[in-house]
Design a protein with these regions (language model features):
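A conserved short coil-to-beta-strand element within the FAD-binding core of flavoproteins
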Residues: 96-109
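Helical element adjacent to the flavin cofactor pocket in flavoenzyme catalytic cores
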Residues: 77-94
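Glycine-rich FAD pyrophosphate-binding loop
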Residues: 23-45
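Conserved small/polar residues in nucleotide/adenosyl-binding loops
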Residues: 119-121
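Glycine-rich active-site loop/strand segments that organize a redox cofactor
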Residues: 42-80
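SH3/SH3-like beta-barrel fold
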Residues: 112-115
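N-terminal Rossmann-like FAD-binding beta1-loop-alpha1 element of flavoenzymes
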Residues: 4-30
Length: 121
């Protein structure tokens, strides 16, 4: 069984932002993502979707918009690319293709995460 004190479930923008903040504070952790980074943006958004805010306002902790169209509105594929670059920028510890199926509390008060890939954390 793998053991880590802090687990973030989901490798989208919120999960990656939390990972950055944990890493910045020296907290060992693992991000578990059911697909690839930004998976929901990859397969659960229309191809034509864009962000509602201009690109210059797109910023995650420690990583501001780095494109060449600050007044534009990033599309789906561009935003996925942004999330991938963000994860790489600080070496986010993402365990990809690992879906969490259950979270239980042990008798000792620890949390046990079961996954489809048979990894217990």
């Amino acid at each position: 069984m793998n053991s880590v004190d802090t687990v973030v479930v989901g490798g989208g923008h919120a999960g990656l932002a939390m990972s950055y903040c944990l890493a910045d504070r020296g907290v060992e952790h693992l991000v578990i993502e059911r697909g690839d980074v930004g998976q929901r943006w990859r397969d659960e958004r229309w191809e034509s979707i864009t962000l509602l805010t201009p690109n210059w306002a797109t910023q995650l902790p420690g990583f501001h918009y780095d494109g060449d169209d600050p007044d534009g509105f990033e599309g789906r594929d561009g935003y996925v690319s942004y999330l991938e670059r963000y994860a790489r920028s600080f070496g986010a510890p993402v365990q990809k293709h690992t879906a969490v199926t259950r979270v239980t509390v042990t008798a000792q008060g620890a949390y046990l995460l079961d996954t489809l890939s048979l990894i217990h954390i």
